[in-house]
Amino acid sequence: MLIRPANNDDRSAIWRIIGPTIRAGETYALDRDLSEADALAYWMGPDRETFVAEEDGVILGTYYIKANQAGGGRHVCNCGYMTDPAAGGRGIARRMHEHSLEHARARGFRAMQFNFVVSSNRRAVELWQSLGFEVVGQLPGVFLHPTEGYVDALVMFRTL
């Protein structure tokens, strides 16, 4: 699997991945009716670096990395990951995360923080914990899940 920086030619493949995830409204605090243009502007924004995971010429996942805060907090990075639902369970998110750790270290980040991991996204919570993240905060009932109602969001953190 090749993980490489995304470019404008990847936009339709990235939308094919992030669009259904956004529309489902189960894991990201984004408007479910976000337009393709706005979703891509968010995912590929100028404040972040965006990557794609590609296998045999097919993009199966994407992630971004950015500084979590400005100024005195810019040594901590934040990432977002999405994989093609049809490619779930193949370790793509794990591979992208491993790549993001290496990239974060190379960029001089000292830690990685996920600000809003929806607690009902159990696969993600378990994956991040298996990769050394700790839950350092729990925000009660802050995410309105489309089928589970109000659920908690977790703040997850690890040093690099």
Locations of the language-model features?
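Conserved acetyl-CoA-binding loop-helix of GNAT-fold acetyltransferases
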Residues: G89-A104, V125-S130
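Conserved GNAT acetyl-CoA-binding A-motif
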Residues: A104-V117
